């Protein structure tokens, strides 16, 4: 399961790059608000809440108990968030390897206490109930 999710994340990284390269349109405000709310939970270290607020595809790709170990391992060494600036937001309806739908790819430039310059990418999906939820989260 972990290998499958890792392959999904790598493929998604290529998708994010491709979608941005082809100049998709800007994100709706409600998607931006959902992304910022999800990141605020991650900033507090609330892995359980981030998993519950994630999209079904995310939950299918990673079990809650695994996510509750993975997020702290990725975020704690970075320290607290000092600043975060939205670099870009792009909408798309197609991404390789995932079902067609409404997606927004957010890229943030983030400064942490232990890493002054990091790039965060957050992929949001508008689910059938009309709510924007996180499908993927990446830190470089």
Predicted features, each with a name:
Residues 89-140:
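Exposed beta-sheet edge and beta->alpha loop/turn motif
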Residues 32-33, 48-101:
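Short solvent-exposed beta->alpha transition segments
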Residues 4, 18-46:
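Short, low-complexity N-terminal intrinsically disordered segments enriched in polar/charged residues
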Residues 7-17:
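Bacterial N-terminal signal peptides
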Residues 22-25, 36-39, 54-59, 109-111:
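Second-shell loop/turn segments in exported
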């Amino acid at each position: 399961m972990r290998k499958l999710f890792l392959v999904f994340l790598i493929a998604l990284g290529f998708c994010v790059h491709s979608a941005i390269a082809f100049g998709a349109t800007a994100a709706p405000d409600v998607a931006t608000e959902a992304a910022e709310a999800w990141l605020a939970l991650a900033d507090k270290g609330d892995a359980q809440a981030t998993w519950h607020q994630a999209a079904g595809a995310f939950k299918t790709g990673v079990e809650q108990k695994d996510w509750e170990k993975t997020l702290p391992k990725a975020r704690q060494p970075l320290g607290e968030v000092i600043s975060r600036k939205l670099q870009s937001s792009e909408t798309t309806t197609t991404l390789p390897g995932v079902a067609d739908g409404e997606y927004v790819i957010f890229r943030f430039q983030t400064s942490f206490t232990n890493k002054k310059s990091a790039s965060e990418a957050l992929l949001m999906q508008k689910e059938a109930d009309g709510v924007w939820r996180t499908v993927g989260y990446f830190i470089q």
